[in-house]
Amino acid sequence: MYDVATNLHKVKDGLPDGVRLIAISKFHPNEYIEAAYNEGQRVFGESHEQELSAKAKTLPTDIEWHFIGHLQSNKVKYIAPYISMIEAVDTLKLLKEINKQAAKHNRIINVLLELHIAEEDSKYGFSIDDCRKLLEEGDWCELKNVHISGLMMMASNTDDTEQIRKEMTLAANFFDEVKAKYFADDPEFKERSWGMSSDYEIAIDCRSTMIRVGTAIFGPRVY
């Protein structure tokens, strides 16, 4: 078995106050999650609703599950009973469906709006202009069973650290704009989710509050 405990502490021990670790457990077996759980990790990220559902039913109930992948509206109902946060909301349609399914379970689901800043067509998310438009039009204000907690983005998949830093800085600056204009009175709009195994140290420099780390903790994925 991969030495999950040692790797987890290597990552966590280097994190400054105010930065949370989301341990990305997709495609990893339950025993790896349990090993991290036994070392105190409580927040895990998954990107497939069926895998998440199966894990949530068998693993400890105090785990905080984050959905980090592209989520189709018709799949929200499968994770609505127990998801803590949906990190990649990229359409108003999805936001409304999360609200609808959360209401059925009499709960409020936290979400992050996903930005598409990376120079790759394969990434999902709002452009900065489209995100402004969504917030300006205000339909989201009527949704009482979702709470927008911040922004999320994935930087370009590149070795160019300056490009990564540029994209994350842009996201951080846009967060400040959105916070001041739309969420100034909401202390819970505070999350900036960027940074993965390969670039989380840059992300921390760029004011990330949540890093998504899988490979550095659990090793290569087990498909």
Annotate each language-model stretch with its function.
Residues 1-198, 204-206, 218:
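Conserved alpha/beta-domain cores
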Residues 208-223:
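Gly/Pro- and small hydrophobic-enriched strand-loop and loop-to-helix capping segments
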